[in-house]
């Protein structure tokens, strides 16, 4: 049974609409979290979604090698994340989330700044490693802070609120980023220089967020941690908790939900970019067309996030995960039946994918947040993020081969099947470890 049930009568300080916030968390802390959420996913996902222009206009990579190179970069990116993310989560239990969240945005900004300066694939890979350490820290800290601030009865709604800002940021900032190369070209710069200046603009956004985070987030280690245990002991909390069926399920869900995000950011815009190029579009027009559907995915997630958050707080988190896996599996598998990737059918598929993407990530995060022990939550969420990195690694390595050598929709079918597998696991856990508070 669930081992970390908290009472719905838990004391709270602030109340933001239906969201109850723990005592000691200030309005500035909450606003800073939302500000970081607005920028966080957008600046991280642009690394992949904006890559076709780097490959083609900066490095001169042949378009039939885009899938291989994208998969290679994501593969090694996730190796770094796997190495770093559990220690980062454990370290945050000892020194607090704030310095590690600031460092995350600094490294992400440096990665974006260096990326268009690469002269070959090896340099591009090196710069990607810097970025990878930043994303490892950002992913773990966003999840940890979003779980630290609310009372249990508002956990899913709080995570939904951060994902709402994620989605708004994705829609607004991705729309801005996709137009920046054209804006710079209209100002008289060539394509390569425009791509470079676009990346540097994204980099500047990251540095602003880093400054905001160090000033605005709650200081110190989480209040639940009363004494500092050895680092290895803290990391072991994340491993030992996997003996509990619901936490083990959340780790499996992390593999799939983060894989869902990876397949979108790594292959979705690249697929649509290549479809546009096959039809004779210019590189910037093809990139813009791909981003249009990417924005629709995020807009759908934006609409769905509040509804899903409220729904999850009113049901067993495992049942919520089952519903999410149905939506996500249907969304990704539907791409196999889209006749024209740039046509009307794709609008409907993009909306379904958006619903599934946000449901999968929100349900898995709220499940691990509820089941993790208050002391050591950072370590458990760090382990959750590590399993998420494994999912991204699998999507990058297998998906890259499928994309280039089998079919451009291969990676999407792969993650669709993975969602169905987790659906089956969730049904089993629901039977063997029911939640008595939602029975």
Q: What is the predicted function of each stretch?
A:
Residues 71-89, 295-307:
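Central cavity-lining transmembrane alpha-helices of secondary-active solute carriers
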Residues 84-96, 303-317, 403:
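Helix-to-loop junctions at the C-terminal end of transmembrane segments
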Residues 106-119, 326-340:
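C-terminal ends and interior cores of transmembrane alpha-helices
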Residues 137-151, 359-372:
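Intracellular juxtamembrane helix-capping segments at the cytosolic ends
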Residues 159-182, 385-395:
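Glycine-rich segments within core transmembrane alpha-helices of 12-TM secondary carriers
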